[in-house]
Design a protein with these regions (language model features):
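Generic recognition of short, well-ordered alpha-helical interface segments
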Residues: 15, 63, 128-132
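Terminal "cap-and-tail" regions of soluble proteins that handle hydrophobic small molecules
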Residues: 2-4, 97-183
Length: 183
């Protein structure tokens, strides 16, 4: 038994079409805008396009494998998604507007049993997941983040030099990364 759920969400952002397409098509950056994603990694080399693949690790503990199957620069992306709990076809449309870009995301998820039964019982869960991801995408693309504030610990570490050097290590990178915003 399988159950198909379709998501269809649209956002408008005040950003040029070429920038929006470049940002979203580099799908390894999904962790910057989808709160359900722990990490995105590009699995293939070379220019982005048909055949590009990405491994997306979800916070729920499973991974997705995205494959780009159709690529129309600044117009459309079509990707297939393979994972244990579901398969999907995700299509993202891009359209220039008077003051920026419209992004439309259409996905068809096919859940396998027993998740198919859960999807029937709680149909709004996937809808909330889609809305949350698109809200995150809009936030990331609009890039209206407050500048970072200095905190006493960082200021003191920088003045004492040696503790400040820790910020330039792998430990410093990892701890600072939690506070970064998408570009």
């Amino acid at each position: 038994m399988t159950r198909t759920i379709q998501l269809d969400e649209t956002i408008d952002v005040q950003r040029p079409l070429h920038e929006v397409f470049a940002y979203i098509s580099e799908f390894s950056r999904i962790e910057e805008w989808d709160p359900a994603v722990a990490r995105g990694v590009r699995s293939t080399e070379g220019p982005l396009g048909v055949g590009s693949q990405f491994r997306i690790d979800m916070k729920a503990g499973f991974s997705l494998r995205y494959s780009v199957v159709e690529w129309e620069p600044e117009r459309r992306l079509l990707m297939t998604v393979d994972s244990k709990p579901f398969t999907a076809r995700e299509e993202i449309f891009f359209k220039r507007t008077a003051d920026g870009t419209r992004v439309r995301y259409v996905a068809n998820f096919d859940f396998v049993a027993p998740l198919a039964r859960l999807a029937e019982m709680f149909p709004g869960v996937m809808d909330r997941v889609g809305k949350s991801a698109m809200a995150g995408m809009k936030r990331a693309l609009e890039d209206r983040f407050d500048p970072p504030r200095s905190v006493w610990g960082t200021v003191l570490a920088d003045k004492l030099v040696v503790p400040g050097v820790l910020g330039f290590t792998r430990f410093g990178y990892r701890s600072a990364r939690r506070h970064w915003n998408p570009v």
